[in-house]
Regions:
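Conserved mixed alpha/beta catalytic, RNA-binding, or beta-rich assembly cores of soluble enzyme
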Residues: 1-52
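A glycine- and small-aliphatic-rich helix-loop capping segment at beta-alpha/alpha-beta transitions
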Residues: 7-12, 77-85
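Generic secondary-structure signature for well-ordered alpha-helical cores
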Residues: 10, 47-55, 68, 91, ...
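Acidic, glycine-rich active-site loops and adjacent beta-strand->loop/helix elements
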Residues: 19-24, 65-69, 103-105
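Amphipathic alpha-helical interface surfaces
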Residues: 38-45, 59, 82, 86
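Short glycine-rich phosphate-binding loop at a beta-alpha junction
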Residues: 57-65
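Phosphate/ribose-phosphate-bearing ligand recognition and processing surfaces
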Residues: 68-80
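Divalent-metal-activated hydrolytic enzyme cores
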Residues: 79-132
Length: 132
């Protein structure tokens, strides 16, 4: 799961790439590598913005990815689980998802243009504006 968070007022932003849904069953609960996990990483990323003075209403949040590239028979469904946990975290924090491009079997690349807040997606070699 690739996530872009951008503060429209402060013009600050961040990108995060999470690999698995939860750190719940890890020995250190994700402390050593929080951004690997959707649950711990999103909570930490949101808190970082809020600690820096951002208001929730000023945040643009976009998500891409969650492809099933190495799981063609759907055994693990890591991407689907990642997106489900991500949406629950947004809901619990009263945050809106402004745009997303998830699922399928193709890789994506996310670009955040800090000066403008535009968020671009590259999929199958094609660039398109996802938000902004």
């Amino acid at each position: 799961l690739g996530v872009a968070v951008y503060d429209n007022v402060k013009q600050t932003g961040a990108l995060m790439h999470c690999l698995v849904p939860s750190a719940r069953n890890t020995s250190d609960k994700g402390v050593s590598d929080p951004y690997r996990y959707v649950d711990v990483g999103m909570a930490k990323l949101i808190q970082t913005f809020l600690n820096d003075g951002s208001k929730k209403t000023d945040l643009t949040i976009v998500a891409v990815g969650c492809a099933s590239m190495n799981d063609s028979n759907g055994t693990f469904e890591i991407g689907k689980k990642n997106f489900t946990i991500f949406r629950k975290i947004l809901w619990k924090n009263n945050l809106l998802l402004k745009a997303h491009d998830v699922g399928g079997e193709m890789a994506r690349t996310l670009t955040l243009k800090m000066a403008s807040g535009e968020i671009w997606l590259k999929k199958q070699g094609e660039h398109s504006k996802l938000y902004g």
